């Protein structure tokens, strides 16, 4: 049985002047999936999300979101999605409860008080109901924003770097909520720069210059990258990393405590570098599996080439 496609778009195009911000993007997201959107700033993530919900028009291509044509049915699409921007976009001079009741009124929910009560309980906002939104910490603001986005029980959640600037504990709790809702059938498309968040996605899509460069599960992307990675521990890790960064074949060299980690595509060149007295000689090296961070640093350093 074929899984239901909540997002199904083909060859999306968007230009600003001479610059192609989105260039032939094709994307399919199935019901109940958490799909991570990754890429450098300016890679086309936000523009794609805005085209999906009809906030900006495409310059080419098309497709459906929730079975509705993104070029013709934007108002109907927006009624069935929750869209959360990186910037907090609710009223800071209203309380948490007042903000949520206002959103319930905008969506003309039948039992607004019950809907607000239920979402406050689910999001753990009981102790914040009477607090002004402007007085909330970053983590609590994002939790309020998420509550407002799902108050009307959307079928699709579009999140644009929702946890930027939020502490690690709040980010983890936010993602726990996302997984709970995805388990109930909510579909999520979320952009992020955090590798720990990318690991929590069922599938990740990496964009560069408006093109999809690679996609798959986190393990598929990491193991299919072709990268070779080595790590070593020693007292001179910082000095070794500085030397190795300038050696042929070493695309990245990073220090983690007393360990140095290197990555590249050319195994022979890497092995020569770590054996060289001018590089990693004197440290005991062993090969390790590449991680997502290795892959994305590698992709950031390369010109965009669309995935086949």
What are these regions (language model features)?
Residues 93, 132-136:
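Conserved ABC ATPase signature
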Residues 157-160:
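Catalytic Walker B motif of ABC-type/P-loop ATPase nucleotide-binding domains
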Residues 174-265:
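ABC transporter nucleotide-binding domain
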Residues 101, 105-128:
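Conserved ABC ATPase "signature" region
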Residues 153:
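Conserved catalytic motifs of ABC-family nucleotide-binding domains
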Residues 61-72, 77:
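Conserved ABC transporter NBD signature motif
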